[in-house]
Amino acid sequence: MDEDGLPLMGSGIDLTKVPAIQQKRTVAFLNQFVVHTVQFLNRFSTVCEEKLADLSLRIQQIETTLNILDAKLSSIPGLDDVTFEVSPVNVTRITNGTHSEATSEQSQQNSLQDSGPQESEVTPENILTVAKDPRYARYHKMVQVGVPVMAIRNKMISEGLDPDLLERPDAPVPDGEGEKNTEESSDSESSFSD
């Protein structure tokens, strides 16, 4: 002990004379902790389960809507002959107000000039393009109607078609598939309409 009566090392308490911790109190604290933790985990799992159920219901509704839209589009006669032009999407960054306006005007003029020669070109040897292929034409029609592109891409993947061709309607049909697959695609369309 120092001159003030404080211990130099340790607490200065003789641990052999200290009474034991009450076991009932310790058990009560542990039980309370376990009960509160379990209640929290139960509430958390209930909230997660409700959110997953809501999400699953929304996915089912979207899938049903997509199937109905697919059936409606497949029931439209003459949809095989539909062709359309897709204008390229121009992305410009806004750095200066006048610079971005000038760039957008130039890009619009360039796209108008580019579209002229494309229309006058004739596909050599009557190659079937994606826009004229009946399997891809209905997906292009879905894009025009306003169906989300990701849903259309997923549908194309599920049917074994290349979703990248959705953005390139002037590209030739892969593997030279043409009129012989028209009958197969109409059979597959009727299998989706419930």
Swiss-Prot record:
It holds the Pfam family CCDC53. Belongs to the CCDC53 family. It comes from Bos taurus (Bovine). Acts as a component of the WASH core complex that functions as a nucleation-promoting factor (NPF) at the surface of endosomes, where it recruits and activates the Arp2/3 complex to induce actin polymerization, playing a key role in the fission of tubules that serve as transport intermediates during endosome sorting. PANTHER family: PROTEIN AD-016-RELATED, WASH COMPLEX SUBUNIT 3. It comes from the Eukaryota. This is WASH complex subunit 3. Keywords: Acetylation, Coiled coil, Endosome, Protein transport, Transport. It is found in: Early endosome. GO terms for biological process: actin filament polymerization; exocytosis; protein transport. The modification N-acetylmethionine is found at M1. InterPro entries: WASHC3 (IPR019309). Residues 98-123 have a biased composition (Polar residues). Component of the WASH core complex also described as WASH regulatory complex (SHRC) composed of WASHC1, WASHC2, WASHC3, WASHC4 and WASHC5. The WASH core complex associates via WASHC2 with the F-actin-capping protein dimer (formed by CAPZA1, CAPZA2 or CAPZA3 and CAPZB) in a transient or substoichiometric manner which was initially described as WASH complex. Residues 98-125, 158-194 are annotated as: Disordered. Residues 46-74 form a coiled coil. GO terms for cellular component: early endosome; WASH complex.
